Amino acid sequence: YRYVDDILILLNQEDLPTVKKAIVRDLKRLGLKTNDKNADGDISQGFEYLGYFLSSSGITVRNSSVLKVEQSLEELIIKMKKEPPEYTEWKLNLKITGFIYGGNKYGWMFFYSQISDTSLLFRLDDLIEKLLKRYGMDPSVRRKRFVRTYHEIRQALHSTSYVPNFDKYSIDDKRRVVSRVYKKDFSKADEHTVEDFFGKIISKEIRDIEKDIQAFS
């Protein structure tokens, strides 16, 4: 679970001193205090909130978060250079689309699904294309796209298969993933063994994928 302790208040400029004092006073009554990251300004200049940048032109991802995911994509592709294409495809696509597991949504695109700036997503898709070519990745890798992921999440999340919902995977689906991606023969393994191995795989993917949205505020 992710807890948010950021407070966003919209008010008239002339009310700022009074409201600011009232907030500090009320927090003290609760045994709380503000930290050094508080800021105020004119809303027309745009502002950052929970990893987003909101302005009159729309909602996008703040620059530092964009740079972080770009770096993460490049690091992953470099790391995958010597891996089989099936494993590369699996890792890269999970980073792009995220996934659903245990009723929870994981991934960068899920977290930033409220943006209106789709030009950023085209930029990320172009970056991946360039990185795959730069590092000589196997052309058989069928990578997914941020732009389509965005639209699937916003418009067809409960019916799409583009964004994996591992809660809907049958035991045979999980066997196929283990066989294709991890090259392990679980064709004769019992359900408990398959479920246990698959659960460990996804737990690791959750840890990896959550790194892209840590320290968002």
What are these regions (language model features)?
Residues 55-217:
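Active-site and adjacent loop segments of nucleotide-processing enzymes
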Residues 1-4, 48, 101-108:
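Glycine-rich, often proline-containing surface loops adjacent to acidic residues and nearby aromatics
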Residues 1-3, 9-85:
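Polymerase palm active-site segment centered on the conserved acidic dipeptide of motif C
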